[in-house]
Amino acid sequence: MAPVGVEKKLLLGPNGPAVAAAGDLTSEEEEGQSLWSSILSEVSTRARSKLPSGKNILVFGEDGSGKTTLMTKLQGAEHGKKGRGLEYLYLSVHDEDRDDHTRCNVWILDGDLYHKGLLKFAVSAESLPETLVIFVADMSRPWTVMESLQKWASVLREHIDKMKIPPEKMRELERKFVKDFQDYMEPEEGCQGSPQRRGPLTSGSDEENVALPLGDNVLTHNLGIPVLVVCTKCDAVSVLEKEHDYRDEHLDFIQSHLRRFCLQYGAALIYTSVKEEKNLDLLYKYIVHKTYGFHFTTPALVVEKDAVFIPAGWDNEKKIAILHENFTTVKPEDAYEDFIVKPPVRKLVHDKELAAEDEQVFLMKQQSLLAKQPATPTRASESPARGPSGSPRTQGRGGPASVPSSSPGTSVKKPDPNIKNNAASEGVLASFFNSLLSKKTGSPGSPGAGGVQSTAKKSGQKTVLSNVQEELDRMTRKPDSMVTNSSTENEA
C-alpha cells in the first residue's frame, strides 16, 4: 500500500496544483453562466408575461345613451367632456400579481351615422383581433333598444367588411371566438381566484374535451371579436313602472329579446346604472377579463330585474324560455315594437306667468292713453249728465221739462232731512262735470274750418253749462218750495 503522500502525488500528477486551480476556475465559470442564464430567463419570462399594449375598446350607442359618461366613470374621472365625431380616452389597467401597468384605448363613436367613416382611425385590419366591442343601449327609453342595437351592429359589420381582411385570417378569428364561447365554464362556488374560462385539462376523460355543438340562433352573426351589450340608466326601471305602467312581463319581454340578440353575436349582457353605481365594478372586471385574460369569478345574475348579468357562453334558448313562463298578454315570438310601444309625445303646456305691473306705471299708461284720445265735436254733448240720484241723463232728456213740476192737486211729500246733504253732494258733482267740460274744450281744433267748428263747440258747451246750472238751481230751489207749500197747507 502506497503512502498517503504518494497517492496524492499520483492523483495530482507532476503539475497537480495547476490542474486543481484550473478545475476550480471551470466550476466558477459554470456557476456564472448558470446565474446569467437564470437572469436572462427571468427577464424573458417577465417580458412574455407583461401586459400587452395596443388593446382597443370600441363603443357604439345613440346620443344621450350615456356611453361617454359610462366610460368616463370606468376611467375614474368625475366629469367627462362630451366630444364630437370620435372621442378618445383610456382605461388604466393594473396587474397586482405582476406589478404591471398598461393602458387600454377607448374609442367612442358619435351617435350620428354621419361620423361612421371615422372608424378607420380607431380600428384597422391589424388591430381588429385586439379589439372589444361595446354596444350601449338606453334603458330609460326601452322602445329604442332593439332598433339601436341592430343599427350599430350593421355599422360594425359594414366596417369589418371594408377592411378586406384575408378570408383565412377572418375564419381563424371566427373559429377562435367560437371556441372561447363553447369553453365557458361557470366558476365554482366559494372558489376565489379560479378562472372563468377553462384552462388546459390535466386530467379527465376525453368526453370533457369535446365541445358541445352550438344551438339554434347561436353565433349566427360571428364578428370574430368579443362583443358586450351594456344597458345604461337601469335605475329608470322604477320610473317606467310608475309613469308607463310597465310590469314584470314588460321587463321580461325586453330581457328575452336582448338575450336573443346576444346569442346571435355571442355577446355578454350587463345592466348598469351610473347614478346608483350599479354593476360598474363588475363591468370593469369583465372588460379586463375579456381583454387581458384576468381571472373572473362572478357567475350569471338574473334575479334582480335592474342588475342582470349574462356572461358570454352561459346563455341558451332553454334558459331564455324560463322568462316566457310569466307571459300572459304577449307571446315570445311577438315583434318587439308591437309590445314595447313608444309612448305618445306629450306637449307640456306651460301657463304663461303674468307679472303684476306696478300700480303707478299702470296709471301713468292710462293717463297717456287718455291724453292721446282726440276730442270729437259731439263728445261734449253726448257726455251723460247725472242727476242727484246718480242716474244718467242724456241731452235730449235734460232741461226743465225733465223735472216734474208739483201741482196744487198732488200730494206733497214730507221734507227729507237729507236734502241739505244732497245739495252739498250736488255741488261736488257740478264742479266735477264742469272740470270735465273744461278739459274737453281745451283740445285744439283743425286749422282752416276750425273757426266754425270751435264756435259751434263753444256755443254747444255754453248751452250744456247753462242747462246743467239751471238744473242744479231748480233742484236747490225745490226743497224751499216744498217747505213753503207745506206751511201754506198747514195754515189753511
From Swiss-Prot:
Subunit composition and interactions: Homodimer. The cytoplasmic dynein 1 complex consists of two catalytic heavy chains (HCs) and a number of non-catalytic subunits presented by intermediate chains (ICs), light intermediate chains (LICs) and light chains (LCs); the composition seems to vary in respect to the IC, LIC and LC composition. The heavy chain homodimer serves as a scaffold for the probable homodimeric assembly of the respective non-catalytic subunits. The ICs and LICs bind directly to the HC dimer and the LCs assemble on the IC dimer. Interacts with DYNC1H1; DYNC1LI1 and DYNC1LI2 bind mutually exclusive to DYNC1H.
Places the protein is found: Cytoplasm, Cytoskeleton
Lineage: Eukaryota, Metazoa, Chordata, Craniata, Vertebrata
Family (UniProt): Belongs to the dynein light intermediate chain family.
This protein's GO CC annotations: centrosome; cytoplasmic dynein complex; cytosol; dynein complex; kinetochore; late endosome; membrane; microtubule
Gene3D superfamilies assigned to the protein according to its UniProt record, in alphabetical order: P-loop containing nucleotide triphosphate hydrolases
Record bears the keyword Lipid metabolism: no
Residues that bear Omega-N-methylarginine: 397
Protein name: Cytoplasmic dynein 1 light intermediate chain 2
